[in-house]
Amino acid sequence: FLLKSQLCYCLFGIELIGAGIHALHEDEIFTVDYCGTNCTKQSNGSWTTCPGNCSCYHEDGKTDGFCLSTEYTDFTQFPNLTSEEMDAATPRPE
Protein backbone atom coordinates (compact mmCIF):
# COMPACT_ATOMS: atom_id res chain seq x y z
CA PHE A 1 0.00 0.00 0.00
CA LEU A 2 2.79 2.42 0.87
CA LEU A 3 4.47 1.98 -2.52
CA LYS A 4 1.19 2.67 -4.33
CA SER A 5 0.68 5.80 -2.24
CA GLN A 6 4.20 6.96 -2.97
CA LEU A 7 3.73 6.25 -6.67
CA CYS A 8 0.48 8.23 -6.79
CA TYR A 9 2.13 11.11 -4.92
CA CYS A 10 5.14 11.04 -7.24
CA LEU A 11 3.08 10.89 -10.43
CA PHE A 12 0.67 13.53 -9.13
CA GLY A 13 3.64 15.80 -8.38
CA ILE A 14 5.09 15.18 -11.83
CA GLU A 15 1.72 15.94 -13.42
CA LEU A 16 1.61 19.25 -11.55
CA ILE A 17 5.11 20.09 -12.75
CA GLY A 18 4.13 19.23 -16.32
CA ALA A 19 1.00 21.33 -16.04
CA GLY A 20 3.03 24.22 -14.63
CA ILE A 21 5.49 24.09 -17.49
CA HIS A 22 2.63 23.85 -19.97
CA ALA A 23 0.99 26.91 -18.42
CA LEU A 24 4.20 28.93 -18.81
CA HIS A 25 4.71 28.19 -22.51
CA GLU A 26 1.60 27.30 -24.49
CA ASP A 27 3.62 26.11 -27.49
CA GLU A 28 5.72 23.67 -25.42
CA ILE A 29 4.72 20.47 -23.64
CA PHE A 30 6.78 18.29 -21.30
CA THR A 31 5.24 14.88 -20.67
CA VAL A 32 6.19 12.17 -18.17
CA ASP A 33 4.91 8.59 -18.33
CA TYR A 34 5.39 5.79 -15.79
CA CYS A 35 6.90 2.76 -17.52
CA GLY A 36 5.22 0.16 -15.31
CA THR A 37 8.34 -0.83 -13.39
CA ASN A 38 10.68 0.45 -10.70
CA CYS A 39 14.47 0.61 -10.45
CA THR A 40 16.68 -0.32 -7.50
CA LYS A 41 20.12 0.75 -6.33
CA GLN A 42 22.45 -2.24 -6.31
CA SER A 43 25.19 -2.95 -3.76
CA ASN A 44 27.87 -1.70 -6.19
CA GLY A 45 26.14 1.71 -6.41
CA SER A 46 24.69 1.27 -9.91
CA TRP A 47 20.97 1.25 -10.64
CA THR A 48 18.99 -1.48 -12.37
CA THR A 49 18.10 -0.63 -15.94
CA CYS A 50 14.70 0.47 -17.15
CA PRO A 51 13.00 -0.88 -20.29
CA GLY A 52 12.95 0.86 -23.66
CA ASN A 53 13.40 4.62 -23.63
CA CYS A 54 12.67 4.83 -19.89
CA SER A 55 15.14 6.16 -17.33
CA CYS A 56 15.46 5.68 -13.59
CA TYR A 57 14.45 8.67 -11.45
CA HIS A 58 15.03 8.57 -7.70
CA GLU A 59 15.45 10.81 -4.69
CA ASP A 60 18.89 11.34 -3.15
CA GLY A 61 19.53 8.85 -0.37
CA LYS A 62 16.80 6.45 -1.51
CA THR A 63 17.40 2.96 -2.88
CA ASP A 64 14.21 2.70 -4.94
CA GLY A 65 13.14 4.77 -7.91
CA PHE A 66 10.65 4.86 -10.76
CA CYS A 67 11.23 4.07 -14.42
CA LEU A 68 9.82 7.03 -16.34
CA SER A 69 9.89 8.19 -19.93
CA THR A 70 10.02 11.90 -20.60
CA GLU A 71 9.36 13.81 -23.78
CA TYR A 72 9.59 17.48 -24.65
CA THR A 73 7.69 18.84 -27.63
CA ASP A 74 8.16 22.36 -28.94
CA PHE A 75 5.19 23.03 -31.21
CA THR A 76 6.72 26.26 -32.51
CA GLN A 77 8.92 24.11 -34.78
CA PHE A 78 5.86 22.97 -36.73
CA PRO A 79 4.21 25.22 -39.32
CA ASN A 80 0.56 26.16 -39.05
CA LEU A 81 -1.38 23.32 -40.63
CA THR A 82 -4.37 23.79 -42.87
CA SER A 83 -7.69 22.10 -42.11
CA GLU A 84 -7.05 19.62 -44.92
CA GLU A 85 -3.64 18.68 -43.50
CA MET A 86 -5.12 18.22 -40.03
CA ASP A 87 -7.90 16.02 -41.44
CA ALA A 88 -5.35 13.92 -43.33
CA ALA A 89 -3.31 13.39 -40.15
CA THR A 90 -6.30 12.48 -37.95
CA PRO A 91 -6.37 8.78 -36.96
CA ARG A 92 -9.31 6.90 -38.45
CA PRO A 93 -11.26 4.16 -36.63
CA GLU A 94 -10.65 0.67 -37.97
From Swiss-Prot:
| Disulfide bond positions | C35-C54, C39-C56, C50-C67
- GO CC terms of this entry: extracellular region
Q: Does the keyword Cell division apply?
A: no
A molecular function (GO) term: C-X-C chemokine binding
Q: Provide this UniProt record's keywords sorted from A to Z.
A: Disulfide bond, Glycoprotein, Secreted
Compartments annotated for it: namely: Secreted
> Which superkingdom does the taxonomy of this entry point to?
Eukaryota
Which positions are glycosylated? N38, N44, N53, N80
Explain the purpose of this protein: Salivary chemokine-binding protein which binds to host chemokines CXCL1, CXCL2, CXCL5 and CXCL8.
Kindly provide the name given to this protein in its UniProt entry.
Answer: Evasin P1172
